[in-house]
């Protein structure tokens, strides 16, 4: 009987959840940045091996909310934990041992799903982590086979939920918006990427190339000027970087048109969050 189930990738911000998801599925799906809190919405990646299908969900980092967007991120992370068949609880190997997930997530009760502690970034640790966890390095691939084998034991017997050739469940337009944000994290400095959101206004696959028109939202006029840059240089560079990422994912040429608008205090405004796809 085949096995199939959801695996939550949970933990504090910047512990390597997105990098691990990408390494497990063999595709760049989730935003990766040295800056914390880059993941705002769960990203689902699929791995099918022989008679087992893993539905990995990269969740926002567990944090103490400072404003309404953080509240939605925390709520999304807790839903991922609550819905999972098995939880991969990530913690940096260099900071072992890991505190209990129930404390980090401030849960009222332990999760119903079994928890496997995963010590990430093992290539950066000076010493092996303590027993009771699995050390992995998404960079070198060390420990990934052991992690997959351990997770497989907890998947329920079930037919596959998705075609074995599929790698993701979300539409391309979702990843297009995410890759625009990833480019912003790469090219913009300090706090500006946290004030930026992206909305896909038009997505057209035919005729070629794939045409995408998107709006980049910031909170202040001064931020708009920075994102556009002198003579439009910054927004052009951002668009080029994002277009390359999208084209690589879908293996098709892409024309990406970006506009920049101000949406004041959108991170603290429930209707704006809903409009931008962040459930309140």
Question: How does the language model describe each region?
Answer:
Residues 1-86, 91:
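Conserved G1/Walker A P-loop phosphate-binding module
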Residues 16, 143, 234:
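Conserved glycine(s) of the Walker
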Residues 22, 41, 45, 75-82, ...:
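Solvent-exposed alpha-helical segments within well-ordered globular domains of core cellular machineries
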Residues 27, 46, 50, 80-87, ...:
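Conserved, well-folded catalytic cores of nucleic-acid-processing
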Residues 39, 62-64, 96-97, 125-126, ...:
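Catalytic P-loop NTPase motifs of RecA-like helicase/translocase cores
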Residues 46-54, 71-135, 187, 204-208:
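Conserved C-terminal guanine-recognition region of P-loop GTPase G domains, centered on the G4
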Residues 112-172:
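Canonical P-loop GTPase G-domain recognition
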Residues 172-280:
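P-loop NTP-binding site
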């Amino acid at each position: 009987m085949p096995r199939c189930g959801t695996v939550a990738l949970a933990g504090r911000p910047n512990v390597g959840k997105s990098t691990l998801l990408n390494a497990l599925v063999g595709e760049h799906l989730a935003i990766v940045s040295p800056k914390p809190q880059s993941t705002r919405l769960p990203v689902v990646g699929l791995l099918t091996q022989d008679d087992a299908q893993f539905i990995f969900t990269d969740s926002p980092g567990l944090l103490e909310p400072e404003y309404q967007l953080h509240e939605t991120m925390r709520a999304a992370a807790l839903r991922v934990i609550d819905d999972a068949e098995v939880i991969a609880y990530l913690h940096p190997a260099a900071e072992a041992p890991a505190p209990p997930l129930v404390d980090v997530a401030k849960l009222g009760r332990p999760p119903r799903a079994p928890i496997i502690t995963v010590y990430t970034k093992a290539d950066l640790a000076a010493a092996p982590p303590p027993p009771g966890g699995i050390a992995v390095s998404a960079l070198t691939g060390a420990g990934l086979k052991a992690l997959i084998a351990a997770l497989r034991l907890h998947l329920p017997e079930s037919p596959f939920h998705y075609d074995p050739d599929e790698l993701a469940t979300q539409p391309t337009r979702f990843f297009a918006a995410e890759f625009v944000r990833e480019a912003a994290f790469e090219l913009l400095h300090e706090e500006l990427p946290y004030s930026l959101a992206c909305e896909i206004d038009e997505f057209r696959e035919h005729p070629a190339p794939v045409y995408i028109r998107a709006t980049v939202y910031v909170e202040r006029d001064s931020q708009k000027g920075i994102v556009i840059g002198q003579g439009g240089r910054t927004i052009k560079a951002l668009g080029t970087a994002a277009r390359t990422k999208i084209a690589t994912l879908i293996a098709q040429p892409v024309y990406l048109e970006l506009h920049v608008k101000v949406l004041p205090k959108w991170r603290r405004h429930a209707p704006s969050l809903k409009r931008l796809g962040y459930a309140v």
